[in-house]
């Protein structure tokens, strides 16, 4: 595809954010996220917008990260992520219609 990277909006999980918290950025590094590393490799740049959705950190250091991120959330985490789905959709719509700066101001945090 011949889509400019700045027109690609990537949504990813983020263990460094509490479950349900959103963080939108216009560009940035992979921050240790393997999926973002792969996207950066294929796009050839870090200059693309991304929306990170907090999933929280695993309950203990020995917990397999892939199992944590791909697992089914429970309890309060599930409720927070359900609310985050709607907010993330709204943030994406805002980004597309009003621009990344407006979306960051409105939805980060």
Task: Give the location of each predicted region.
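Conserved TIR/SEFIR loop-to-helix hotspot centered on a Trp-containing motif
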Residues: 30
């Amino acid at each position: 595809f011949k889509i400019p990277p700045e027109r690609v909006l990537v949504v990813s999980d983020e263990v460094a954010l509490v479950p349900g918290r959103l963080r939108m950025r216009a560009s940035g590094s992979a921050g240790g996220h393997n999926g973002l590393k792969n996207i950066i490799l294929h796009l050839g740049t870090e200059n693309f917008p991304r929306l990170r959705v907090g999933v929280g950190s695993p309950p203990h250091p020995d917990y397999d990260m892939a199992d944590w991120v791909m697992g089914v959330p429970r309890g309060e985490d599930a409720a927070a992520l359900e609310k985050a789905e709607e907010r993330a959709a709204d943030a994406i719509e805002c980004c597309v219609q009003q621009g990344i700066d407006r979306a960051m101001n409105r939805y980060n945090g």
